């Protein structure tokens, strides 16, 4: 009986060690200071003013790693990379789509509170107010491919510039209508 307990304890120890060794290359390949993914953010609902119906957004898969860099000028940069999957549901009809959004990105919050972001690859959900969607000629809710860059002023958080060198992969509202 004692031998069985020792064998079981060694088995548990080796399994735990195997899990650590298996996870290490994923973090090591990204270098130091990368934080492993946390569970996807909580689902949220956009009001009908965005799509003509209430839209539920959830993140069933989150394998996104983050690195936080603090700068001498008081700004903070967030680097992120990895796979995220978002699901979008029209709450009026129940129609839903799921979209992989695997693009890396960089967001800098400047000391004055303004924000600059650059995303490449597949990225989303990119959400604009109806007024900003009209101003920039983009859908209110989209998944995009290519380089998406934008700047936001310090509070009250007005988009001051936006460029998409790529294309809209999914106009979420149109896809769920």
Report residues per predicted region.
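Functionally constrained cores in energy, signaling, and assembly domains
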Residues: 5, 15, 139
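Bacterial N-terminal signal peptides that target proteins for export
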Residues: 1-10
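Beta-strand-enriched cores of mature, soluble protein domains
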Residues: 29-177
